[in-house]
Amino acid sequence: MKKFLSLTVLGVSLVSLAACGNSSSKTETKGSLDNEASKVLTVKHGNVRQNFDKIIMANASQEFSGGLNLDSLKGLVCEPTSTSHEQAGDATLDVYNWQYDNVVVTAKLFNNSTVVKSISTFSYVRDSKITLKMYEDLKNGTSYDNAVKTLGVPDVYSIAVSSDATMTQALWSSNLVTKKGKTGSLTLNFKNGTLENKSQENLINK
């Protein structure tokens, strides 16, 4: 199934989170940047964010099998709020959305196997630690795991599996050092787990 899923099927934009900041009600849990990746932070809809991490993706080398099926998704995030269909090349994807206040989880399935997942408009509450220098020090080729060790877990992210590559877009918004009165964002795009490009808004050094 050649290129049945184009990279544009990442679909749900994460950019909208950049302006959301700390708008929703949350309970703050503080921790060092080094251990944030393994800490459970207590935030509004934090359980949704945790369950989103558990959504297993399809394997492109096995005809896109192995991804979480709809029944398993319902077990993690309940009944979908809405459903639709989407063409991706020669394939038809089943698209499911779950909405929790402003937080939206999307899963796109091919043959009942998850090939795209995304979460938007979610943010943690944590100390502002990511500086412009930390951003500048991130080089193309950096692994996703190493980026998380440096920055902490992203607030939101999306993954799309295609016959070409597995693409991950991750966005940080809650732990940034930014210009006074400004909302910032840091976005990293990974191809097969390695950093391909990056962008930021309003980051500064302490």
Which residue ranges define each predicted feature?
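Hydrophobic helical h-region of N-terminal Sec-dependent signal peptides
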Residues: 6-14
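Intrinsically disordered, low-complexity Ser/Thr-rich linker and spacer segments
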Residues: 46-51, 112-137, 201-206
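C-terminal motif of bacterial Sec signal peptides marking the signal peptidase cleavage site
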Residues: 15-19
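Second-shell loop/turn segments in exported
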Residues: 55-64, 130-138
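A cross-family detector of function-defining hotspots
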Residues: 29-45, 66-112, 143-206
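Positively charged n-region of N-terminal signal peptides that target proteins for export
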Residues: 1-4
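Bacterial signal peptide processing site
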Residues: 21-23
